[in-house]
């Protein structure tokens, strides 16, 4: 699973600069083609969202909803960076999951 994550600041900056962005009320998605046959995921949650407990909860919800929808007709070969907005701090799993799927469909990655 380590190779499926975007970890370095340089990799995040590359996706921000070269990628295309899509957004809704809860999340922002940056998408950029990569040279691998796998999708790599990065999650960013600002301190504006809340204290560390809240930020980590939002991160876990995003990662889990992505993991559970990974096998369902998703195109491969993209770097995906999800950024949580302030309004995501009090949402539950279903809200985050529907926002995530909505963004993936907007980007044309999820069928």
UniProtKB/Swiss-Prot annotation:
Its EC number is 3.1.26.5. InterPro entries: Ribosomal_Su5_D2-typ_SF, Ribsml_uS5_D2-typ_fold_subgr, RNase_P. It is an enzyme of class 3 (hydrolase). GO terms for biological process: tRNA 5'-leader removal. It comes from the Bacteria. Coiled coil: none annotated. SUPFAM superfamilies: Ribosomal protein S5 domain 2-like. One of its GO terms (cellular component) is ribonuclease P complex. Keywords: Endonuclease, Hydrolase, Nuclease, RNA-binding, tRNA processing. The keyword RNA-binding applies. It catalyses: Endonucleolytic cleavage of RNA, removing 5'-extranucleotides from tRNA precursor. The keyword RNA-binding applies. One of its GO terms (molecular function) is 3'-tRNA processing endoribonuclease activity. RNaseP catalyzes the removal of the 5'-leader sequence from pre-tRNA to produce the mature 5'-terminus. It can also cleave other RNA substrates such as 4.5S RNA. The protein component plays an auxiliary but essential role in vivo by binding to the 5'-leader sequence and broadening the substrate specificity of the ribozyme. Belongs to the RnpA family. Consists of a catalytic RNA component (M1 or rnpB) and a protein subunit. This is Ribonuclease P protein component.
